[in-house]
Amino acid sequence: MATLVGKKVVIVGGSSGIGLGVAASTLERGAEVVIVGRSPQRLQAAERTLATADGRVRAFAADMTQETEIARLFDDVDAFDHLVSTAGGPPPADPINRTDREIVRRFIDDKLIGAFMVAKHAVRVLKTGGSMTFTSGINKDRPPVPGGAVVSAIAGSFSYLARALSLELAPTRVNVVSPGWVDTPLFAELAGEAKLSLFEDMAARLPALKIATPADIAPAYIFAMESEFTTGQTLHIDGGQSLI
């Protein structure tokens, strides 16, 4: 397998949650990391969290719904080795009969179309032999709760995106990581005061008997970057949640 020592890795969504966990793990393996997020405040906090990286971290603010900002991002980043995208905001959660068209449109624009645009502009400066790794989620693999139609549809689309792009962009490798529930700021925002009870119930049902942290999910992204013979695949890192 390849090594990340001396490689440049761009992490879209790297200012918090899974993306920040991937950034920390990537730095531990000797890479240079570029974290990208929408919020300058979160980026500054992430830089402080990663402050032991001896200047190997840079941060860029960019909105993934704005193609001009994505294009400028990769112009500024210039040549790099690996792309990781964990970006995406809170999904719509209303039942279909109460779904608001504009809320759905914004989520699709942010999560799916944003991924397309990131791939479009990243490939201009991605080095030969590099990789792209996107993020889907558990909703595509198990019966979703009522109100989960939109997020399930988008999560499912990423497997097909990776398969198509792995052929179109070869030899660039394109893969997807599909996590289950992860203890992140986004989950806390969605669950509110119910988070603790939800986590306790789910952990008791999972074969892994615990809820993942970003550090539990990060090794899958490392594998996707380092494994030179893995492309077009979806890696299910869910503690067995897709089985229950």
Regions found by a protein language model. Give the residues of each.
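Conserved glycine-rich cofactor-binding loop
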Residues: 15-17
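Active-site-adjacent segment of SDR/Rossmann-fold oxidoreductases
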Residues: 125, 164-173, 228
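Short, flexible catalytic-loop segment of classical short-chain dehydrogenase/reductase
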Residues: 179-189
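Catalytic Tyr-x(3-8)-Lys segment
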Residues: 195-216
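C-terminal substrate-recognition "lid" of short-chain dehydrogenase/reductases
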Residues: 210-237, 242
